[in-house]
Amino acid sequence: MMKIYKIILGLSFILATLSIGPGCRQNYVPTDDELADYGWVLFSQGDYVGARDWFQLSIDKDSTYMDGYCGMGWSNGKLGYADTAYQYLHLGKDMTYDDIRFPNQVNLPIEFTAGLVFASSAIGNDSLTIAHSQEFDFKQTQIQVDLGNGSYRWTLKNVLFTSLEYDSKIDAQDVRLAWSMAQYNTSQFAECVSNIRIIRDDADISGVFEPDISTVQGRNEIAKELEKLQLLLSS
């Protein structure tokens, strides 16, 4: 909970600065990461407009601040502006990640890739959804190797949101579901079934899923399973 207090304390200094006249020489100047962190606090509270404003402040202060672009992407996505979300995530994804300045943001690159999966899906571009999903899968595998933990699964802003006692309910399962849907839409039925099985395994769903992908009935089974998984993961 100390992280929350630090963020709120920083906010109080910012507000105090705004109320102090220009004659004061030692106004508090919030750092870009404090601005962005408070944006994520607002995000966790469902205030996506407020979060977006704070993320915008962070990149206005430092146009190279990677997490500010990440927050802008996710906030705009939550507000239903998929095109804008994609633009910010695309702008920020190839920025240089400074793991010395921000050691707690070790998974920041994959946050961008996951966001791009959802933005592409919302836009309705199945090819982009598949491409970004494949990139996400590669990055997650690399993290598993680095951690020596093959069971690792990405969760949005896991460290920060855990400290806030907030469950975003956005994780690797949702990415794989978006990937599966894009595969279904592009008639990649075998690949879709493979991803569905992984989702089922991770969710501890019992039973065998063996639809006949060569038949209309089998493809209908896939569609129904995707609907079930969507309901399950959104609950």
Residue ranges of predicted features:
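Canonical positions in the second alpha-helix
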Residues: 57-58, 91-92, 136, 199
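Residue-level recognition of tetratricopeptide repeat
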Residues: 65, 99, 109, 140-143, ...
